[in-house]
Amino acid sequence: MSEFNNVSVVKEANIYFEGKVTSRTVIFPDGSRKTLGLMLPGEYTFNTGSAELMEILSGEMTVVLPGSPDPVAIKGGEAFEVPENSSFKVNVTAVSDYICSFL
């Protein structure tokens, strides 16, 4: 799906890591939320409240997921899941466009 229809968008941006990671929140008619964002090259650690599905639309990164010491290479067209109440580390090597779905 290349677009979302009949949604609301929160105008205020979510800005993290001194502006190197930004996103906008999209609210669907059923109340579910996703964020659409961009990550610039760098290393970042994110904490989760709920489980997340991270879809990488373009770009490249390595990800260290909870319970795994080894980084996994992720590129545009791929996705990964993160459990609730955990954290994950990313090393973004190319500007990355993403969708985060809260599961």
UniProtKB/Swiss-Prot annotation:
Membership in a protein family: Belongs to the nucleoside phosphorylase PpnP family.
Gene Ontology cellular component list: cytosol
GO MF, any single term: thymidine phosphorylase activity
Function: Catalyzes the phosphorolysis of diverse nucleosides, yielding D-ribose 1-phosphate and the respective free bases. Can use uridine, adenosine, guanosine, cytidine, thymidine, inosine and xanthosine as substrates. Also catalyzes the reverse reactions.
Reaction catalysed by this enzyme: a purine D-ribonucleoside + phosphate = a purine nucleobase + alpha-D-ribose 1-phosphate; adenosine + phosphate = alpha-D-ribose 1-phosphate + adenine; cytidine + phosphate = cytosine + alpha-D-ribose 1-phosphate; guanosine + phosphate = alpha-D-ribose 1-phosphate + guanine
InterPro entries: Ppnp, RmlC-like_jellyroll, RmlC_Cupin_sf
Protein name (Swiss-Prot/TrEMBL): Pyrimidine/purine nucleoside phosphorylase
Record keywords, A-Z: Glycosyltransferase, Transferase
EC class of the enzyme, as a word: transferase
Keyword RNA-binding set for record: no
EC number: 2.4.2.1, 2.4.2.2
